[in-house]
Amino acid sequence: MKFLNSITTLCIGAHPDDVEYGMAGTFSKCRDTDFVVLVMSEGGDWDKTTTYNDRKKENENVWSMFSNVSGVVNNQDFVKDQPEDDMINFIETNLSDYYFDTIVTTPQEDSHFEHRMVNHLGPALCRRDSKTLIEYRTPSTLNHWIPNHFEPLEPYNYEVKKAALRKFTSQQKAPYFNEKCIDSFHHNFLCSKKGFNMVESYRIVESYSI
């Protein structure tokens, strides 16, 4: 199965675990799509207990669970220290060997300002080509963000995702890594009425047929 008919999808996160928290179930489900994860910094301002190599290793441990996932971690402390044009240049230079038909970013309607900064990269990366642009839900996505695409997860896919999230060992004490919070993140009332108990949520911003 493919993710929205995509052959190769670029998934951009501001921090380690952003993409995986929002999309790891889709990685497990949509094995016919190749996903490239790009992490734009090593983590947040308040985490002084881990290094770039620590967080990079956590990401790599997750990516190794999926035959269709690879990734790059930008060796930068923060997103906020990177001008937008530098981030675009980094992406277009370091990932020039790929052709992405789909780009997925953090939402604009998000309480984390670095997520909003990463969201701005999407339209710039789609400026020349008919790429599909999508936002994935994060733990800090605001309530008035409205998804328009759901990926239902089978129990197997969901268990794979939870196992993947456990590999972010440095983050296990964060409230949003609590199992009840993770379960709540994947519930949608309207989807549950239709028999889909666990879903990942997306907002398609702009879509083109492939």
PLM segments and residue spans:
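The feature marks non-catalytic terminal segments
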Residues: 1-2, 64-68, 98, 102, ...
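Active-site beta-strand->loop->alpha-helix modules in alpha/beta enzyme cores, enriched
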Residues: 1-135, 190-194
